[in-house]
């Protein structure tokens, strides 16, 4: 009997998620270090690389959503996984060529720019493939295959995997990257790339097995389109859908710099607050730990209050804790700094809990034929918020002006509460199987 047949569908989906997330997190963690090995002292090179990746993903996201809706599940999974595979493989090749060119004294060569752009484009393709796979697994296969009464529990395990890989994969990747022969400084990068490539193979066969053996009916496809039509985006239609306001409430949270994992906040704590790196690192690690609490609190409140009410409580908790955090921040004393950081950590329970709720609401409410379109819209809005936030940060004349971003962040979270309450108050009751989820 094959090993795959011994695993439940939910377990196979979670295992696939673990494989792809661990590889993604490890690769993303070491790419800027590898760029700094090739271009020492040139932090702007790494920043420019990620800017290209973000903008490229932003531009291709709506089209990828339309493409998902017009193609069979097995084809979507195949393209998502193998697009990542060949993009990472290309990235390894371009890194090797860049390193060789620089070592040979070719810093002024036109080929250097060409190879860097090629490397960045491979990053765009890897990001796009990851996004396609995430939407396919989390937003299409999961709501189609997991029993409605088990969906909250399943999503909690998805979140645990995401948080575990967010913490664990960079630690392992950092250890691999640090140990290398003197003559081959990118050996760690290539090992991590190989780890990624190997992980894609079982991931693909797991997901293919899930689709083929689950008895899942053929996906309701929207009308097939030409490639030209796929790139013609009707955002007005997506924005007019009622689900947009749910998506917007979550996207507003991405306009916040009040995150343990935020690079802007970390820079401020180091430059203005003079906190040591060890304390900043501990703060970052505890952010994931507090996020794990939501994987227990959210399902508990769903059982007691319902999906919408649990989401409201968690989002409200984030607003209250950040309100206290910003008040402490405004005081400016040494003690208030730690109150500020402590409340940010507490707010992660609310943030991750609401994230679970918003994710499950999209799973339950978006019709099958529009899952690609509307879930890619969610990615589009969060990416837009990230670009807006970093653009605002780059315009700050002095580090001390970071305080304005802190106040804007609180306003964005409070606005998210207003938008979500207004949207959810119109939902009434959603029936899922034999269970009613009362949106109170």
Regions found by a protein language model. Give the residues of each.
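Primarily residues marking transmembrane-helix entry/exit sites
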Residues: 3-14, 43, 112-120, 226, ...
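C-terminal transmembrane helical hairpin of 12-TM major facilitator-type secondary transporters
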Residues: 309-354
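Substrate-agnostic recognition of the 12-TM MFS/MFS-like secondary transporter fold
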Residues: 12-29, 49-68, 72, 76-84, ...
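Transmembrane alpha-helix termini and helix-breaking/packing motifs in multi-pass membrane transporters
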Residues: 32-39, 96-104, 167-195, 299-300, ...
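Short amphipathic helix-loop junctions that connect adjacent transmembrane helices
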Residues: 29-44, 143, 263-280
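Multi-pass alpha-helical transporter architecture, strongest
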Residues: 60, 94-96, 195-208, 322-329, ...
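Juxtamembrane intracellular "pre-TM" segments in multi-pass secondary transporters
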Residues: 1-10, 209-250, 271-272, 438-440
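C-terminal ends and interior cores of transmembrane alpha-helices
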Residues: 82-112, 317-333
């Amino acid at each position: 009997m094959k090993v795959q047949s011994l695993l439940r569908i939910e377990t196979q989906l979670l295992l696939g998620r673990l494989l792809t997330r661990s590889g993604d997190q490890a690769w993303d963690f070491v790419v800027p270090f590898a760029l700094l090995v090739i271009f020492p002292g040139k932090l702007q090179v790494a920043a420019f690389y990620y800017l290209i990746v973000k903008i490229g993903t932003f531009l291709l996201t709506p089209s990828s959503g339309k493409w998902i809706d017009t193609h069979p599940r097995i084809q979507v999974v195949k393209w998502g996984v193998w697009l990542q595979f060949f993009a990472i493989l290309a990235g390894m090749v371009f890194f090797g060529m860049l390193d060789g060119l620089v070592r040979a004294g070719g810093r002024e060569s036109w080929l250097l720019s060409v190879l860097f752009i090629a490397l960045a484009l491979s990053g765009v393709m890897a990001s796009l493939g990851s996004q396609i796979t995430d939407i396919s697994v989390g937003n299409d296969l999961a709501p189609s295959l997991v029993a409605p009464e088990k969906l909250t529990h399943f999503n909690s395990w998805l979140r645990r995997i995401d948080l575990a890989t967010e913490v664990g994969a960079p630690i392992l990747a950092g250890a691999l990257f640090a140990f290398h022969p003197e003559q081959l400084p990118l050996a760690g990068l290539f090992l991590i790339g190989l780890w990624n490539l190997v992980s894609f193979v079982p991931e693909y066969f797991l997901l293919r097995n899930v689709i083929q053996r689950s008895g899942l009916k053929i996906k309701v496809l929207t009308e097939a389109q030409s490639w030209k039509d796929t790139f013609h985006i009707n955002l007005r239609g997506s924005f007019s859908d009622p689900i947009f306001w749910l998506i917007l409430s979550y996207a507003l949270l991405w306009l916040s710099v009040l995150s343990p994992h935020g690079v802007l906040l970390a820079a401020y704590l180091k430059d203005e607050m003079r906190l040591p790196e060890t304390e900043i690192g501990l703060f970052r690690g505890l952010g994931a730990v507090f996020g794990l609490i939501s994987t227990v609190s959210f399902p508990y409140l769903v059982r007691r209050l319902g999906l919408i009410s649990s989401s409201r409580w968690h989002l409200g908790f984030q607003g209250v804790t950040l309100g206290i955090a910003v008040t402490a921040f405004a005081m400016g004393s040494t003690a208030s700094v730690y109150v500020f950081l402590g409340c940010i950590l507490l707010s992660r329970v609310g943030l991750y809990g609401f994230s679970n709720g918003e994710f499950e609401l999209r799973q339950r409410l978006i019709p099958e034929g529009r899952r690609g379109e509307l879930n890619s819209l969610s990615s589009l809005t969060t990416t837009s918020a990230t670009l807006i936030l970093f653009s605002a940060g780059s315009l700050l004349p002095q580090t001390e002006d970071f305080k304005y971003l802190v106040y804007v962040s609180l306003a964005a979270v409070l606005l998210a509460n207003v938008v979500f309450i207004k949207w959810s108050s119109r939902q009434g009751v959603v029936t899922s199987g034999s269970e009613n989820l009362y949106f109170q």
